[in-house]
Swiss-Prot record:
Swiss-Prot/TrEMBL keywords: Acetylation, Cytoplasm, Host-virus interaction, Nucleus, Proteasome
Domain of life: Eukaryota
A GO-annotated cellular component: proteasome core complex
Compartment list: Cytoplasm; Nucleus
Modified positions (N6-acetyllysine) in chain numbering: 77
Phylogenetic classification of the source organism: Eukaryota, Metazoa, Chordata, Craniata, Vertebrata
Protein name, per record: Proteasome subunit beta type-3
UniProt xrefs under PANTHER family: METALLOPROTEASE TLDD (PTHR32194), PROTEASOME SUBUNIT BETA TYPE-3 (PTHR32194:SF10)
Modified residues (N-acetylserine): 2
Length: 205
């Protein structure tokens, strides 16, 4: 069994027209044993910037804390909000530093540029190799199912409501086909003037 699937979990981000969405499941378990259904996997890293972490639960929390520390230092030194691309470099550095004994988590970043409001999504592997795309990124135990749903449902230039419907359907249907993720989904829709957070009910088995 892979250490990446020990706790299970699924994270996904999608790009729309002047907006992005990031979603994650709510389950925290130890293999087949379920522990809690309100585990946080998406963390705010700025006003319009979020990171989702799928993988080993201890490393999810460790990486989130260490990243927040580095982010606070950056904002104190620079006196401005971090750009999504810069956050990606920061995460890549954090992961690559520990490449010989890595953090077992594969991050997904979604957000808008603080000045231009240009949408940005990317994913990284567990040693910090980034992949920036213009459609969607996925991470977690049901990555294959999420890719299948996203490739079927995603369209370019979706408005926020259409984007929410698409990412919700993709996420709910993907986690239904994975035994170690699910138990509800949380979705953040990031727009220029607001962030909408919705919690979706899913199968509880």
């Amino acid at each position: 069994m892979s250490i990446m699937s020990y706790n299970g979990g699924a994270v996904m981000a999608m790009k729309g027209k002047n907006c992005v969405a990031i979603a994650a499941d709510r389950r925290f378990g130890i293999q087949a044993q379920m522990v809690t259904t309100d585990f946080q996997k998406i963390f705010p890293m700025g006003d319009r910037l979020y990171i989702g972490l799928a993988g080993l639960a201890t490393d999810v929390q460790t990486v989130a804390q260490r990243l927040k520390f580095r982010l606070n230092l950056y904002e104190l030194k620079e006196g401005r909000q971090i750009k999504p691309y810069t956050l990606m470099s920061m995460v890549a550095n954090l992961l690559y530093e520990k490449r010989f004994g890595p953090y077992y988590t594969e991050p997904v970043i979604a957000g808008l540029d603080p000045k231009t409001f240009k949408p940005f999504i990317c994913s990284l592997d567990l040693i910090g190799c980034p992949m920036v795309t213009d459609d969607f990124v996925v991470s977690g135990t049901c990555a294959e199912q999420m890719y299948g749903m996203c490739e079927s449902l995603w369209e370019p230039n979706m408005d926020p409501d259409h984007l929410f419907e698409t990412i919700s359907q993709a996420m709910l249907n993907a986690v239904d086909r994975d035994a170690v993720s699910g138990m509800g989904v949380i979705v953040h829709i990031i727009e220029k003037d607001k962030i909408t957070t919705r919690t979706l009910k899913a199968r509880m088995d």
